[in-house]
Amino acid sequence: MVFRIASSPYTHNQRQTSRIMLLVLLAAVPGIAAQLWFFGWGTLVQILLASVSALLAEALVLKLRKQSVAATLKDNSALLTGLLLAVSIPPLAPWWMVVLGTVFAVIIAKQLYGGLGQNPFNPAMIGYVVLLISFPVQMTSWLPPHEIAVNIPGFIDAIQVIFSGHTASGGDMNTLRLGIDGISQATPLDTFKTSVRAGHSVEQIMQYPIYSGILAGAGWQWVNLAWLAGGVWLLWQKAIRWHIPLSFLVTLALCATLGWLFSPETLAAPQIHLLSGATMLGAFFILTDPVTASTTNRGRLMFGALAGLLVWLIRSFGGYPDGVAFAVLLANITVPLIDYYTRPRVYGHRKG
């Protein structure tokens, strides 16, 4: 009898990295479409800029490292990094910001560690945080959803603002950010945090046009539901596992509910947390990154729960209105520790 000796891994996933990345890119279509509908063509321009920047940055580093450029670019990971960063920033942010953030994400946060599979932090979120800390005004200058907007920029206007800072008619970001009440608009989370700190009551805040949505913030609720739809499709395709999204959303909802019940005059209701900002994008497309997330099922549950708790804490008590990016990176730090204490016991060996 002949015994074959094989080395690990002993189980194999037949799906290639490029196919998984492609599935994630396809799943992002509903979310992208929703952002285009509510915030205009700027999102598409940012995606194109980020995609080109990501591919060029990755190709440059691979060339310097004398590695195969074509083979690596085919894994679609650079495209996904650019896409996730592009949909996370305001649609009319200056062109150089998305280029800078994408190049930093690909070269510093990914390739500097050795490339795909070696980076401990989510590259897109590293790029986002670098931009947010460096350029806080531009990174929080979101347009009002078209439902409550006074000026809705077209495709040409979006290009002109992104590359020159103003439209052909002289309109700038201050003009484009005006809502139907004549006040510059912000995201639902940003508006809530700023208004509470200014001493406004929750009853007053909920009367603002940005909260005119059926469930949560105008426009943002549908954007989040679109990302949720894409995430459910990823689960159905088995491109991601359910542990991280579920534990993240349950923890965020639980913390938000308890906080709202105990302090309804200062803390946002759970539906605002779940359907505003980057909640669903983070739950299904960012936290589930197989490279930077936990690798065990118990670990994934802990990882998602930790991220959900951090998002609520940052949104409720921190200095930034959303907090998803910071929560992801802080949770990434804990992955080695989580994996160490949740790794399954080797058969035939005692626990401990």
Swiss-Prot record:
<keyword id="KW-0285">Flavoprotein</keyword>
<feature type="transmembrane region" description="Helical">
    <location>
        <begin position="148"/>
        <end position="168"/>
    </location>
</feature>
<dbReference type="GO" id="GO:0055085">
    <property type="term" value="P:transmembrane transport"/>
</dbReference>
<keyword id="KW-0472">Membrane</keyword>
<protein>
    <recommendedName>
        <fullName>Ion-translocating oxidoreductase complex subunit D</fullName>
        <ecNumber>7.-.-.-</ecNumber>
    </recommendedName>
</protein>
<comment type="function">
    <text>Part of a membrane-bound complex that couples electron transfer with translocation of ions across the membrane. Required to maintain the reduced state of SoxR.</text>
</comment>
<comment type="similarity">
    <text>Belongs to the NqrB/RnfD family.</text>
</comment>
<feature type="modified residue" description="FMN phosphoryl threonine">
    <location>
        <position position="187"/>
    </location>
</feature>
<dbReference type="GO" id="GO:0022900">
    <property type="term" value="P:electron transport chain"/>
</dbReference>
<keyword id="KW-0997">Cell inner membrane</keyword>
<comment type="subunit">
    <text>The complex is composed of six subunits: RsxA, RsxB, RsxC, RsxD, RsxE and RsxG.</text>
</comment>
<feature type="transmembrane region" description="Helical">
    <location>
        <begin position="301"/>
        <end position="318"/>
    </location>
</feature>
<dbReference type="GO" id="GO:0005886">
    <property type="term" value="C:plasma membrane"/>
</dbReference>
<keyword id="KW-0597">Phosphoprotein</keyword>
<keyword id="KW-1133">Transmembrane helix</keyword>
<keyword id="KW-0288">FMN</keyword>
<feature type="transmembrane region" description="Helical">
    <location>
        <begin position="214"/>
        <end position="234"/>
    </location>
</feature>
<feature type="transmembrane region" description="Helical">
    <location>
        <begin position="20"/>
        <end position="40"/>
    </location>
</feature>
<dbReference type="InterPro" id="IPR011303">
    <property type="entry name" value="RnfD_bac"/>
</dbReference>
<keyword id="KW-0812">Transmembrane</keyword>
<keyword id="KW-1003">Cell membrane</keyword>
<feature type="transmembrane region" description="Helical">
    <location>
        <begin position="42"/>
        <end position="62"/>
    </location>
</feature>
<feature type="transmembrane region" description="Helical">
    <location>
        <begin position="123"/>
        <end position="143"/>
    </location>
</feature>
<keyword id="KW-1278">Translocase</keyword>
<dbReference type="Pfam" id="PF03116">
    <property type="entry name" value="NQR2_RnfD_RnfE"/>
</dbReference>
<keyword id="KW-0813">Transport</keyword>
<dbReference type="InterPro" id="IPR004338">
    <property type="entry name" value="NqrB/RnfD"/>
</dbReference>
<feature type="transmembrane region" description="Helical">
    <location>
        <begin position="242"/>
        <end position="262"/>
    </location>
</feature>
<feature type="transmembrane region" description="Helical">
    <location>
        <begin position="267"/>
        <end position="287"/>
    </location>
</feature>
<feature type="transmembrane region" description="Helical">
    <location>
        <begin position="78"/>
        <end position="109"/>
    </location>
</feature>
<keyword id="KW-0249">Electron transport</keyword>
